[in-house]
């Protein structure tokens, strides 16, 4: 069965973005960027893949993307209505309309939809791209966390998981460190 994997960048104090969806405060490095491009090229937006020579690269881990409205909306400013056209894209939103054949807008119960997607035959998993509200809604279905932890305190912003109090156990399975002080850590549900 496929897994729902929450692959996300986060500050030391648990924020995936600033209060206005800023992510430019994360320290970058060529070492980490090269690692991400090789290991998870499908997590790079389509318009950037073309600029850095990843256009046409095979998806390594994911073939399906779930994205909430708050994470999706910045793509409209680029402008694009299909930020990850190399993946099957599901936009979870009860209010946003997108007229793009590559994006399926889901207004229904996202938990039921995730359960159906998990039962599909595929050697690739499902990427929960964000945001924190959607992660909170889907917490019961998240099988694995891949957290890019950056050595910075944001102070406030968009929480990695938003929702009610729901302690959920995960066990660490791997960790990689980079020259910018960031780490990628893998956690599986206990």
Q: Where do the protein language model's features map onto the residues?
A:
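Enzymes that bind and transform nitrogen-containing heteroaromatic metabolites
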Residues: 1-190
């Amino acid at each position: 069965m496929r897994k729902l994997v929450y692959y996300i960048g986060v500050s030391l104090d648990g924020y995936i973005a600033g209060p206005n969806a800023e992510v430019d405060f994360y320290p970058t490095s060529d070492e980490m960027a090269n690692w991400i491009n090789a290991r998870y090229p499908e997590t790079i937006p389509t318009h950037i893949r073309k600029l850095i020579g990843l256009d046409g690269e095979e998806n390594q881990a994911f073939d399906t993307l779930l994205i909430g409205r708050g994470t999706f909306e910045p793509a409209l400013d680029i402008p694009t209505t299909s930020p990850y056209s190399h993946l099957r894209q599901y936009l979870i939103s009860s209010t946003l309309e997108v007229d793009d054949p590559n994006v399926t807008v889901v207004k229904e119960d996202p938990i039921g939809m995730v359960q159906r997607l998990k039962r599909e035959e595929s050697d690739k998993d499902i990427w929960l791209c964000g945001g924190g509200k959607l992660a909170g809604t889907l917490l019961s279905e998240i099988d694995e966390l891949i957290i890019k932890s950056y050595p910075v305190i944001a102070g406030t912003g968009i929480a990695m998981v938003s929702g009610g109090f729901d302690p959920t156990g995960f066990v660490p399975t791997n960790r990689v460190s980079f020259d910018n002080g960031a780490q990628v850590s893998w956690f599986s549900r206990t």
